[in-house]
Amino acid sequence: MTKRYWNIILEEMMEAGVHFGHGTRKWNPKMSPYISANRKGIHITNLIRTARFLSESCDLVFHAASGGKQFLIVGTKKKAADSVARAAIRARCHYVNKKWLGGMLTNWYTTKTRLQKFRDLRMQQKTGRFDCFPKKDAAILKRHLAQLETYLGGIKYMKGLPDIVIIIDQQEEYTALRECITLEIPTICLIDTNSDPDLADISIPANDDAIASIRFILNKLVFAICEGRSRSIRNS
């Protein structure tokens, strides 16, 4: 796989607070190689390592996107949710940013059935079919549709399992990560100093609590995906 230059600048990472980890009491000893210092009880991530693994991740998603692969971005905590949705929409990726429903990938048949129900209800609403039902029944259908939109809206166009899953915050999205491991779906995971770097295929050590840090990482990955898609279009 050819390496490319992704303009990952250390000063910009510092401005985004990418280097700030968790308190020294909340850490995983496996993260020791990725920590450069202890500042006032806070672990500081080695940004050289961060840049290296972020660059590797960008190379991976670029080549995958140029080959027409499908991506799923997962980040459900409040600080990540909006950034995940914007990044995914920009790169035409699927996303989950509200709640990970257990078995979303490992029980794909059930998820596919829910998605079909979601699409059917959306079509009924668009064509005015809800107006044909009694008010009480229509209200129930609208609530059900709203619930499906909340939890499945980001994957409504997903026809099968994703080729690569990008996860924001390993601790928060552990269930999603385990499902990917079970199904052998490649993962890129943003990990803080309290995480296990051995679980994902590529782990990017970075601050997973600051919005600016999350956006910085996502922006680089999304740019690489968009570049890969553009290359695919040019070569077709």
Swiss-Prot record:
Gene name linked to the record: rps2
Pfam families: Ribosomal_S2
CDD domains: RPS2
Region forming the signal peptide: none
Superkingdom assignment: Eukaryota
Subcellular location field: Plastid, Chloroplast
Entry protein name: Small ribosomal subunit protein uS2c
Protein's organism: Phaseolus vulgaris (Kidney bean)
One GO MF term attached to the UniProt entry: structural constituent of ribosome
Keywords: Chloroplast, Plastid, Ribonucleoprotein, Ribosomal protein
Major localization class: plastid
This protein's GO CC annotations: chloroplast; mitochondrial small ribosomal subunit
Stated family: Belongs to the universal ribosomal protein uS2 family.
PROSITE patterns in alphabetical order: RIBOSOMAL_S2_1 (PS00962)
Keyword set includes Ribosomal protein: yes
Gene Ontology terms: biological process: translation
